[in-house]
Regions:
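Hydrophobic alpha-helical segments
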Residues: 52-103
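Hydrophobic alpha-helical membrane-insertion segments
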Residues: 28-34, 95-100
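Structural signal for membrane-spanning alpha-helices in multi-pass inner-membrane proteins
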Residues: 36, 40, 95, 105-108
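Membrane-interface extramembranous regions at the lipid-water interface
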Residues: 1-28, 73-90, 104-134, 154, ...
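Membrane-helix interface segments in multi-pass membrane proteins
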Residues: 31-74, 129-137, 141-165
Length: 165
């Protein structure tokens, strides 16, 4: 039972391999995107047009709490990924440094973890649903790129033609 609790993705102790890290971040993104979509349907009167550009204080507090939760869980996943690389969790603060965060993210996504036990425990096996989620993510990224690149090229051509006229 305690192994299951320690292996929970919501706990900072333990390790995340690359696939687990991507899958849990994707799951987090889906959760918060779903919250946003539900909120948009429940609170249609809270749009900027109906509020004359002013946001109500309770809504602002709720949004700050939601963003705070998203950042908190992202840092938890980041710490677990750093543990897989046998690095201290304090390195996760690099994610808040502009430009460094881009290189740091690439490092975490591309660098393999340690196959043996390290200071932070044994390697965590990637669960089947995590692998499935990563494959889904890659398929969606390829499909999105297949539509986005030609659409962007079309936009650039139209913008150049408009400048010439």
């Amino acid at each position: 039972m305690s192994n299951t609790i320690q292996d929970s993705g919501w706990n900072a102790s333990g390790r995340f391999g690359r696939r687990s890290y991507i899958a849990w971040n994707m799951l987090l993104g889906f959760c918060f995107m779903s919250i946003g979509i539900i909120a948009a349907f429940i609170l249609p009167g809270m749009s900027p047009e109906t509020l004359d550009g002013k946001m109500s204080m309770p809504l602002m507090v709720v949004l700050v709490l939601i963003y705070g939760l998203a950042i908190y869980f992202s840092v938890i996943f980041l710490i677990r990924r750093l543990h897989d690389r046998n690095h201290n969790g304090w390195l996760s603060l690099l994610i808040f440094v502009p430009v460094v965060n881009l290189v740091f993210t690439l490092y975490l996504l591309l660098a393999p973890g340690h196959n043996e036990s390290n200071d932070y425990g044994s390697p965590r096996t990637t669960r089947g649903w995590e692998t499935l989620l990563v494959v889904l993510y890659l398929v969606l990224a390829v499909i999105l790129a297949a539509f986005a690149v030609p659409a962007y090229q079309n936009y650039v051509e139209r913008a150049q033609q408009a400048q010439m006229e």
